[in-house]
Amino acid sequence: MRWLMVAAFALCSQAALAQTAAPGDALLYIISPNDGQRITGPFWVQFGLRNMGVTRAGDTAANVGHHHLLVNADAKDLDANAPIPTDRRHLHFGGGQTETRLDLPPGKHTLQLVLGDAEHKIFEPAVISQKVTITVVDPKTPRRPKARRKPARSR
């Protein structure tokens, strides 16, 4: 009887750690801003997803998830068996949102999307976008003038 309880506990533990399956052709991407873009002030980030659907957190339907936007963080550092954190570097969009407006301080920043399942965990295989690097420019900082060519002299 004791071994039966141990086996049941082991199965339940493995089920709790199991990741939700995602189609192998799922593609998560950032529509805007573009990689390398220079941005002034608050800006919109638009999320894109192919071959899966976007839903609210907690929805256990197959092939759907919700977005998490990583700001100056790397998806490689996430624990696949734990919920994706929710903090200023890991923004959670559990209402099924597909865009957000960010206001970041001047400087270089990275943005990366991760699709979370009903329990805010990473899918298997992971559905993660490429990183986008942007530079937020202070609107008060004057731009350097471009070098002007001298007009050719006529003879």
What would you call each of these model-derived segments?
Residues 80-102:
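A beta-strand/beta-hairpin structural motif
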Residues 125-145:
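Short beta-strand elements
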Residues 59-67, 128:
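Short coil-to-beta strand junction motifs in C2/discoidin
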Residues 20-40, 141-155:
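Short, compositionally biased P/S/T/A/G/V-rich stretches that sit at domain boundaries
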Residues 41, 65, 105-107:
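A glycine-anchored, Pro-Gly-centered beta-turn/N-cap motif
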Residues 76, 116-124:
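Short acidic/polar inter-strand loop motif in beta-rich domains
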Residues 48-59:
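Short amphipathic, basic-aromatic surface patches that mediate peripheral association
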